[in-house]
Protein backbone atom coordinates (compact mmCIF):
# COMPACT_ATOMS: atom_id res chain seq x y z
CA UNK A 1 0.00 0.00 0.00
CA UNK A 2 1.38 3.38 -1.00
CA UNK A 3 1.55 6.30 1.39
CA UNK A 4 0.14 9.75 0.56
CA UNK A 5 3.62 11.26 0.17
CA UNK A 6 4.64 8.48 -2.24
CA UNK A 7 1.54 9.10 -4.33
CA UNK A 8 2.25 12.87 -4.40
CA UNK A 9 5.76 12.21 -5.75
CA UNK A 10 4.60 9.71 -8.34
CA UNK A 11 0.97 9.01 -9.19
CA UNK A 12 -0.42 5.58 -10.01
CA UNK A 13 0.18 4.60 -13.61
CA UNK A 14 -2.72 3.14 -15.59
CA UNK A 15 -2.21 -0.27 -17.17
CA UNK A 16 -1.66 -0.22 -20.92
CA UNK A 17 -3.66 -2.88 -22.71
CA UNK A 18 -2.08 -4.86 -25.54
CA UNK A 19 -3.89 -4.84 -28.88
CA UNK A 20 -5.48 -8.15 -29.88
CA UNK A 21 -4.76 -7.68 -33.61
CA UNK A 22 -1.31 -6.03 -33.79
CA UNK A 23 -0.82 -6.47 -37.55
CA UNK A 24 -3.78 -4.15 -38.24
CA UNK A 25 -2.34 -1.33 -36.12
CA UNK A 26 0.46 -0.17 -38.42
CA UNK A 27 1.24 0.37 -42.08
CA UNK A 28 4.38 0.74 -44.16
CA UNK A 29 5.18 4.30 -45.28
CA UNK A 30 6.90 4.01 -48.67
CA UNK A 31 8.30 7.56 -48.69
CA UNK A 32 9.91 7.31 -45.24
CA UNK A 33 10.65 3.57 -45.66
CA UNK A 34 9.44 2.65 -42.18
CA UNK A 35 6.35 1.46 -40.34
CA UNK A 36 3.91 4.11 -39.13
CA UNK A 37 1.31 3.55 -36.43
CA UNK A 38 -2.28 3.87 -37.62
CA UNK A 39 -5.11 1.45 -36.95
CA UNK A 40 -7.18 -0.10 -39.73
CA UNK A 41 -10.40 -2.11 -39.39
CA UNK A 42 -9.25 -4.42 -42.22
CA UNK A 43 -6.18 -4.88 -44.37
CA UNK A 44 -5.68 -6.43 -47.79
CA UNK A 45 -3.32 -9.35 -48.24
CA UNK A 46 -2.19 -12.16 -50.51
CA UNK A 47 -2.52 -15.84 -49.56
CA UNK A 48 0.81 -17.63 -49.28
CA UNK A 49 -0.52 -21.02 -48.19
CA UNK A 50 -4.05 -22.42 -47.75
CA UNK A 51 -4.32 -25.53 -45.58
CA UNK A 52 -6.09 -27.15 -42.60
CA UNK A 53 -5.37 -27.49 -38.89
CA UNK A 54 -6.85 -29.57 -36.06
CA UNK A 55 -8.32 -27.65 -33.09
CA UNK A 56 -7.37 -27.82 -29.40
CA UNK A 57 -8.25 -30.67 -27.04
CA UNK A 58 -12.02 -31.16 -26.57
CA UNK A 59 -12.88 -30.33 -30.20
CA UNK A 60 -12.25 -32.36 -33.33
CA UNK A 61 -12.37 -31.06 -36.91
CA UNK A 62 -10.26 -29.85 -39.82
CA UNK A 63 -10.36 -26.05 -39.67
CA UNK A 64 -9.38 -24.20 -42.83
CA UNK A 65 -6.87 -21.36 -42.55
CA UNK A 66 -4.54 -19.34 -44.76
CA UNK A 67 -1.13 -17.81 -44.24
CA UNK A 68 -1.48 -14.23 -45.53
CA UNK A 69 1.07 -11.51 -46.31
CA UNK A 70 -0.63 -8.19 -45.54
CA UNK A 71 -0.16 -4.90 -47.38
CA UNK A 72 2.06 -3.64 -44.55
CA UNK A 73 4.47 -6.55 -45.06
CA UNK A 74 3.55 -8.64 -42.02
CA UNK A 75 2.57 -12.31 -42.30
CA UNK A 76 -0.44 -13.54 -40.32
CA UNK A 77 -2.48 -16.72 -39.98
CA UNK A 78 -6.14 -16.07 -40.85
CA UNK A 79 -9.17 -18.34 -40.45
CA UNK A 80 -11.47 -19.01 -43.41
CA UNK A 81 -15.05 -19.08 -42.03
CA UNK A 82 -18.01 -20.91 -43.55
CA UNK A 83 -18.54 -24.13 -45.47
CA UNK A 84 -16.34 -24.49 -48.56
CA UNK A 85 -14.07 -21.87 -50.14
CA UNK A 86 -12.32 -21.16 -53.43
CA UNK A 87 -9.11 -19.64 -52.02
CA UNK A 88 -5.71 -20.76 -53.22
CA UNK A 89 -2.16 -19.45 -53.32
CA UNK A 90 -1.87 -15.82 -54.61
CA UNK A 91 -5.56 -15.07 -53.90
CA UNK A 92 -6.25 -11.49 -52.75
CA UNK A 93 -8.16 -11.41 -49.47
CA UNK A 94 -9.44 -8.88 -46.94
CA UNK A 95 -8.37 -9.66 -43.36
CA UNK A 96 -10.15 -8.46 -40.21
CA UNK A 97 -9.33 -8.99 -36.54
CA UNK A 98 -10.96 -11.67 -34.41
CA UNK A 99 -9.41 -14.80 -32.98
CA UNK A 100 -10.52 -18.42 -33.26
CA UNK A 101 -10.71 -19.82 -29.75
CA UNK A 102 -9.73 -23.41 -30.50
CA UNK A 103 -6.92 -22.69 -33.00
CA UNK A 104 -3.71 -21.50 -31.32
CA UNK A 105 -2.01 -18.58 -33.06
CA UNK A 106 -4.97 -17.66 -35.28
CA UNK A 107 -5.92 -14.05 -34.47
CA UNK A 108 -7.49 -12.93 -37.74
CA UNK A 109 -10.46 -13.78 -39.98
CA UNK A 110 -10.77 -13.57 -43.74
CA UNK A 111 -13.78 -11.51 -44.87
CA UNK A 112 -16.03 -13.64 -47.10
CA UNK A 113 -17.56 -11.93 -50.13
CA UNK A 114 -14.69 -9.43 -50.53
CA UNK A 115 -12.00 -9.58 -53.26
CA UNK A 116 -11.19 -13.22 -54.22
CA UNK A 117 -12.94 -14.79 -51.22
CA UNK A 118 -16.37 -15.72 -52.55
CA UNK A 119 -19.44 -15.83 -50.32
CA UNK A 120 -20.79 -19.08 -48.90
CA UNK A 121 -23.16 -20.77 -51.37
CA UNK A 122 -26.72 -21.80 -50.41
CA UNK A 123 -26.74 -19.87 -47.14
CA UNK A 124 -30.14 -18.61 -45.93
CA UNK A 125 -29.50 -17.26 -42.41
CA UNK A 126 -26.67 -15.04 -41.15
CA UNK A 127 -25.77 -14.21 -44.75
CA UNK A 128 -24.02 -10.90 -44.02
CA UNK A 129 -21.29 -12.65 -42.02
CA UNK A 130 -20.49 -14.96 -44.92
CA UNK A 131 -20.92 -12.64 -47.93
CA UNK A 132 -23.95 -14.44 -49.38
CA UNK A 133 -26.45 -12.67 -51.62
CA UNK A 134 -30.21 -12.96 -51.12
CA UNK A 135 -31.38 -16.04 -53.05
CA UNK A 136 -33.80 -15.48 -55.95
CA UNK A 137 -37.37 -16.51 -55.15
CA UNK A 138 -39.01 -19.10 -57.43
CA UNK A 139 -42.43 -18.14 -58.79
Swiss-Prot record:
GO biological process terms on file: translation
Gene Ontology molecular function terms on file: rRNA binding; structural constituent of ribosome; tRNA binding
Matching Gene3D superfamilies: Nucleic acid-binding proteins
Species the sequence originates in: Aster yellows witches'-broom phytoplasma (strain AYWB)
The protein, known as: Small ribosomal subunit protein uS12
Record's subunit section: Part of the 30S ribosomal subunit. Contacts proteins S8 and S17. May interact with IF1 in the 30S initiation complex.
Highest taxon listed in the record's lineage: Bacteria
Function field: With S4 and S5 plays an important role in translational accuracy. Interacts with and stabilizes bases of the 16S rRNA that are involved in tRNA selection in the A site and with the mRNA backbone. Located at the interface of the 30S and 50S subunits, it traverses the body of the 30S subunit contacting proteins on the other side and probably holding the rRNA structure together. The combined cluster of proteins S8, S12 and S17 appears to hold together the shoulder and platform of the 30S subunit.
Feature: compositional bias, Basic residues: 8-18
Record key words, sorted: Methylation, Ribonucleoprotein, Ribosomal protein, RNA-binding, rRNA-binding, tRNA-binding
GO cellular component, one term: small ribosomal subunit
Ranges where the record places region Disordered: 1-21
